[in-house]
Amino acid sequence: GDDVSLAARLGALLSTLRERPGVRLRMEPGIYHFYPQGLPLHRWNISNHDACGGQAAGLLLEGFRDFTLDGGGSRWVFHAQMLPCRVAHSSGVRLENLSLDLARPVYSEGVIREVRPQRMTVWIDPEKYPWNVENGRLVFTGENFRRAMHLWLEMDAKTRAPAWGTEDLYFCTETQKVGLHPAIKAAAGDLVQITLKGGEHFFAGSRAGNRLVFRHHPRTAPAVYAADSKDICCENIRVHHAAGMGFLAERCENVTLKRFDVTPSPGTGRCFSAAADAAHFVNCGGKVALEGCRFENQLDDGLNVHGFYAVVRG
């Protein structure tokens, strides 16, 4: 249900189970909304993500052994700035049978209505993706953000893949100094008009009817984040959106993703799933296995496995 205290109450329950290896906790089917109210804020240095200050975790499993959380087919929806699931300093943890999404995606979408070499008209649903034009910039708002669009990616209306003959298109903002300098204005009917200047022009492959994915938010949190843990398994998990990667493990040993899908949320019409890689492994050892997973429309790599350089202090 839509209860702002749900995450805090779940955390209190989990604290009583930490010292009881072998517990299986099963959720009833349904839709659960998670809010950061009443939760402690943490500053995690998450590999390949942007620093964002403190953030709360919806599900926080630290120091658990042989623990299973069965979502029972439930759907978890996260509000404001939250890291949905974190597993750390644990072993034998299983997460299964649930889907993860954000109430307000950290990216937005629009549909091209008209396109010329230097002018484009785009329709943006103000209910799904609240927006306005401020000081000549296209600004999107959410429960915890107000940010100017700095980049878009055009998606083919039929294939829902990046449109042929286009690529990432960058726009200048207060923090991004390289890119186009368009004149942007709002028009009637929830339309926005983007007019380029001088010798700037839109890609020849741009077409009316195609969708634009607007980027306007930093990469702040994966949907599932595992750190310093061993023998971790995620099975029958669906990540529909995340403010970063779908799954990220660092300094872990023996990790299995089985039917771990990163796909756009059904019925939303979205052309994007995770804001970055579907799955990412950093400095992990043992066996890393992916079985029967489906990754689509994430906005970076499907799978990335690597180490990193770090400073060792004696």
How would you name each of these model-derived features?
Residues 237, 246-248, 279, 290-296:
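Conserved catalytic-core segments centered on acid/base and nucleophilic motifs
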Residues 33-59, 103-220, 259-282, 298-314:
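Acidic/polar low-complexity surface segments
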